Amino acid sequence: MDAVTRIEQALTSAVGRADAPGCPPKLAAAMRHAVFPRGARVRPRICLAVAHACGEDNAALTDAAGASLELLHCASLVHDDMPCFDDAATRRGRPSVYKAFGEPLALLTGDALIVLAFQTLSRVPCDGQRLASLLMIVSRSVGLPHGIVAGQAWECESEIDVEHYHRCLLYTSDAADE
């Protein structure tokens, strides 16, 4: 199976969990809107290519890792498009999540996609140490001091240390590329 098919299947499976009984239907729809139709899927493609080059021994884990990276990327786009940041009315040629579903649901959608990224990785059977390492890499790419959250927070500062902000962007890319 080719990389694009693997990525799309992993994302469809992950986002499909939002259709579980009890999940608010508007949240599920907003999550689908954020993830599909697809963008370039650069991050998961790189993930799959690196795993293949390193002798991939757990395709399910590779697919989950790629999906997790894409879910985090989509979450960052949902949050970044909101009026409190970039106020972007469109994303990928259609209304951004906040324009289509409102600000409160957009905020929850971004948060739900972050949680879903971790859940997607956690569901794959693998060695505990390997899973812990992957979860740490993913959490570093999202959190503090250099992840997506830190990068977004730098945009809220009245004075920006450009060198530190640049380092933050590099760490975010490095963590995602591990």
Give residue spans per PLM region.
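Conserved N-terminal diphosphate/IPP-binding helix and adjacent helical/loop segment
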Residues: 1-65, 72, 78, 84-87, ...
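Residues on a specific face of well-ordered alpha-helices
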Residues: 9, 107, 111-115, 119, ...
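Membrane-interface starts of transmembrane alpha-helices
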Residues: 24, 62, 102, 106, ...
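Residue-level signal for inorganic ion chemistry
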Residues: 46, 117, 151
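Divalent-cation-assisted or electrostatically stabilized phosphate/pyrophosphate-binding catalytic cores
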Residues: 87-112, 159-170
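Histidine- and acidic-residue-rich, metal-dependent catalytic cores
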Residues: 112-125, 138-141, 145, 173
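Histidine/acidic-rich helix-loop-helix segments that form or flank divalent-metal centers
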Residues: 126-167
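Conserved small/polar residues in nucleotide/adenosyl-binding loops
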Residues: 171-178
